């Protein structure tokens, strides 16, 4: 199938992917722009996995204070080069992720950051809530509830507040695919007036 330049341009504007990647995705999806976006998102996740081991020593720390002055967030986002760290897209994503932390109160950056004892404690609570169910059903329910816990407690697993069709990790993977660099949120701290650390 021959893909028009207008369609390639539209997909590029939507995703920020390269011309050739957009053309290939549109050919693979037979001109369906929604499928092409999904293809590019999957490619972004694959690219992110390849780049995950690379050192991220550059980056920025952003501060967000909610308009009422009662909630504040400091967030560090890293990349490989200062060139990427200075781009508007990188800075905007970091700032929006600080807003995400302010609004959604994650406790961890990634699911790998959740201590094993916290996971075991959550599992105990879930098992106690459903102890009357058959054993083979209990494990499936516990896994489902644990997945929900990760979606609430881990920044990367949360639904993005500005686009509920994506998770935070999808946005980071898209930026990794676009820049060709490893990008990650290293840490954040959320403050709320009246809350103890």
UniProtKB/Swiss-Prot annotation:
It comes from the Bacteria. It holds the Pfam family EF_TS. Keywords: Cytoplasm, Elongation factor, Protein biosynthesis. Its main location: cytoplasm. One of its GO terms (cellular component) is cytoplasm. SUPFAM superfamilies: Elongation factor Ts (EF-Ts), dimerisation domain, UBA-like. GO terms for molecular function: translation elongation factor activity. The keyword Cytoplasm applies. Gene3D superfamilies: 1.10.286.20, DNA helicase RuvA subunit, C-terminal domain, Elongation factor Ts, dimerisation domain. Residues 81-84 are annotated as: Involved in Mg(2+) ion dislocation from EF-Tu. Belongs to the EF-Ts family. Associates with the EF-Tu.GDP complex and induces the exchange of GDP to GTP. It remains bound to the aminoacyl-tRNA.EF-Tu.GTP complex up to the GTP hydrolysis stage on the ribosome. HAMAP family: EF_Ts. This is Elongation factor Ts. It comes from Thermotoga neapolitana (strain ATCC 49049 / DSM 4359 / NBRC 107923 / NS-E). The lineage of its organism: Bacteria, Thermotogati, Thermotogota, Thermotogae, Thermotogales. The gene is tsf.
